[in-house]
Every structure is written in C-alpha cells, then in structure tokens.
Amino acid sequence: MINQIKTYLLMALLVGLIYAICMMLHIHPLIAIILALIPNVIAYYMSDKLVLMSYNARILEEHEMPWLHQMVERVARKAGLPKPKVAIVPTETPNAFATGRNPENAVVAVTEGILKLLSPEELEGVIGHEISHIKHRDILISTIVATLAGAIVMIAEWMLYWGGIFFVSEEEESNPLELIGTILLLILAPIAATIIQFAISRQREFYADEEGAKLTHPLWLANALAKLERGVELYPLERGNPATAHMFIINPFRKDFIAKLFSTHPPTEERIERLLEMCKRIGK
C-alpha cells in the first residue's frame, strides 16, 4: 500500500513538473496537460520495455539456460509469486535488476558478467534480492523513478535550448529572470534527479537484501555482493543511462567522488555486515 502511494505521488510529481515547465514555455494548457500525461502512460506501461531495450537485454526462452529458469522459478515459488520472465544483458559488467509494473509482468535481468563471476548459490542469493523487489512492488517505483529522473534532466535541456526561442514571440521582450531560472534548472536538475533516486533506493536495498536472504541464504547474498562490488570496479558499465543506476543490485557505473557522495545505493560493506549479522541471528 505504501509503495502504491509513493508511485502515485511520483506520477503526480512528474505531471506537475512537466505542466509547470510547459506553462513557462507558453504552451497551450490543453497541450501541456497531454504532454504531462504522456510520460506517465509510458512509465506505467512501457518503462520496463524501454529499460530492457536500452541495455539490449533479450528475454530468454524456456529452453535457453533451463537451469536459470528453474532457479528463478524456485525462488519465486518460495515468495509466493508467479515466475517472472528472465532476460540476459550482453555486458561483462556483473550485475542484475528487476523491472515491470507488477509481479504478473515482471522481468529479472542478469548480465553475462554475473553468470561468469558468481557461483550458483551466490547467483541464487542475487535472484532472491530481485524477487523481493518484485514481491514488494519496488519495481514499478524503480522504473517510474528512472523515468522521472530522466525527464527532469531532459526538461532542463529543453528549457535551455527552447526557452525564449520557439515559445516567445518576436514582440515579447525576453525576461532575464526566465533565463536565470532556466540556467538554474539546468544546473540543479541532475542533482534533483539523483536526490529522488537516493531517497527511494537506499532503504529499499536494505529491505530487499533482508527479505531476499530469507528466501535463499544471507551468506550467499553477502558473498555475491562482495564479488559484485569488485567486479563492477574492474568492469564498470561504460554505456547506459545513469538514471537507471538505482535499479541494479550494485551501482554499475564508474564511481568518482561526486558519484559516491550522491550514491543511489547504501555502502556495500554495510549491506554485507547486515547480512552477516543476520547469519548469526538465525544460526546459519
């Protein structure tokens, strides 16, 4: 229920943001409403397909990697969910993510790199983490946040390029305050997008770690996270949209100082410590 409320709030924020920008650009209110609603329709019905497409992910048929299908089905059954589709991402960056608007339309995507790096038990721990996201409907929030974050940056670029050029008549004098506002939006938009991801992602990852570990084994996931952290450092994702970073189990992009400051994920060391503490509590 809480995640559904968050989803509606995010969608309302996206509508309000785009509508306000359209008003600043002197677009007709009816057209502005249509433009504001389109991203939400896309976010709800197509964002999972767009995310998979952006990473050249391919849905695996049942006869392809049957052992992986069986693993996903086994963990999903423990969670009381239908088996999600399984996709493969052609990159050496070891990682995984889940997407889709609900458990009935979910996809678990794994990279070629993660299949090479992890043992079957460690991979099952990762699958448990992603299945937990699906069970608690984090995946719709993730895809909408990715759309919202991307939209914020895109709108800022629109305003810089179009503001005062296409939507201001020759008779109107340009307003220096609008120009200043446009420049400020361009500067602050990426920060705002990251803050939105930051607010949604960090606690969600801790919870998915714990719930996913209950479906499999906390030590399996702890070992997997340690390997993935090192693997991403060696093989960071060179191509991709940073607005989707929060969807992955580990941030797949190269981490400079600023990226670490505004990280969309909690520190991997802290996640591992929590899982090891969980091992002690349950005696595994």
UniProtKB/Swiss-Prot annotation:
PANTHER family linked to this entry: PROTEASE HTPX, PROTEASE HTPX HOMOLOG
GO MF annotation, one: metalloendopeptidase activity
Enzyme class: hydrolase
Pfam families in UniProt: Peptidase_M48 (PF01435)
Native organism taxonomy: Archaea, Methanobacteriati, Methanobacteriota, Methanomada group, Methanococci
Subcellular location, record wording: Cell membrane
Free-text comment on the cofactor: Binds 1 zinc ion per subunit.
GO cellular component terms, A-Z: plasma membrane
Keywords carried by this UniProt record: Cell membrane, Hydrolase, Membrane, Metal-binding, Metalloprotease, Protease, Transmembrane, Transmembrane helix, Zinc
Assigned protein family: Belongs to the peptidase M48B family.
Bilayer topology annotation: Multi-pass membrane protein
Membrane as UniProt keyword: yes
Positions annotated as active site in the UniProt record: 130
TM region(s), chain numbering: 7-26, 33-47, 148-168, 180-200
CDD domains the UniProt entry points to: M48B_HtpX_like
Main localisation: membrane
Residue sites binding Zn(2+) per the record: 129, 133, 205
The enzyme's E.C. designation: 3.4.24.-
Cited HAMAP family: Pept_M48_protease_HtpX
Protein name: Protease HtpX homolog
One GO term (biological process): proteolysis
Cofactor entry: Zn(2+)
InterPro entries per record: HtpX_protease, Pept_M48_protease_HtpX, Peptidase_M48
